[in-house]
Amino acid sequence: KCYAEAEAGKYIEKSLKAIEERYNEIIKGLGLKLSLKEQFETIKKNFEALAGKDYAASRGEYLNGIIMANYLGYEFIDAATVICFDKDGEFDSEKTNEVCEAKFANIERAVVPGFYGAMPNGKVKTFSRGGSDVTGSIVARALKADMYENWTDVSGFLAADPRIVNNAKPINVITYKELRELSYMGASVLHESAIFPVRKGGIPINIKNTNAPEDKGTMIVETTCNMPEYTITGIAGKKGFVAISIDKDMMNSEIGFCRKVLSVFEDNGISIEHMPSGIDTMTVFVHQDEFVEKEQKVLAQIHKAVNPDSVELEANLALIAVVGRG
């Protein structure tokens, strides 16, 4: 709201003051001798200069980090000084690792806010949803940690979505690869991109519950001989797909058939999620929201490209992923 007012050229003093007063209440409740006056003055100046929505979105995390560091007696490190994005806004993994290694070399304990960093020009840039998981993973890799503990509001991963399956069993051990598959298909305990930094460093992740710290949680590892009770480790799924089924007699003997079909989707900027096929049939699964407005154009181009006997559509589908070992 406050930044929206700044964008509209409105007076933001009142809104920002209310936020500052709330933070002061928190500081007082924690019994801290801490003032955020200087930080709020900087925020006001940057809001008025329209520093960007990413800057605005990250200020709560930034201020909470300062308070947490003060409460714990740890050093505060602004993520904008150690988490690096390139000039195009893409995360720069290697540069970030170098900067973090140098920054943390002589620091024993620190608090680093999550989900944002900065581009080369100093402009604040945020990660996508769940970016705090990524920040923790990046720092764990830079520190060459023995383990990355990720504290959340659930006791690790469950074998299925508890909103759909009653009494879903907890997963005690899962591999990076299995987790990537489940996260991509909708399991949302841990941001899928958080796996890459620690995987490079061979660092296991332990998902723990803040509200039940005694629970074992889920260990995420590179590989394991620990076999689950069942062959299936977990099940996850996503909604919102459409299936385009293409039939043509002797399809299997026609050179380049699949390539021609896939080129149609590529030319229209539609990503393909799944592609099962048979001797005379291939089915392409795509995100329905990407396909619906281009539907007739795509169908016409498929007919022109491969002259199929028939093309059928089935909408409002879900894709289910079954992940396991054995």
Predicted feature locations:
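Terminal amphipathic helices with adjacent charged low-complexity linkers/tails
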Residues: 1-4, 158, 207-224, 286
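Nucleotide/pyrophosphate-binding catalytic subdomain
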Residues: 1-190, 195, 287
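Short hydrophobic alpha-helical runs that function as membrane-insertion/retention elements
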Residues: 147-151, 205-207, 273
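Acidic/polar loop patches that form or flank catalytic/metal-binding clefts of enzymes
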Residues: 191, 202-209
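A conserved regulatory-domain signal marking ACT and ACT-like small-molecule sensing domains
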Residues: 216-326
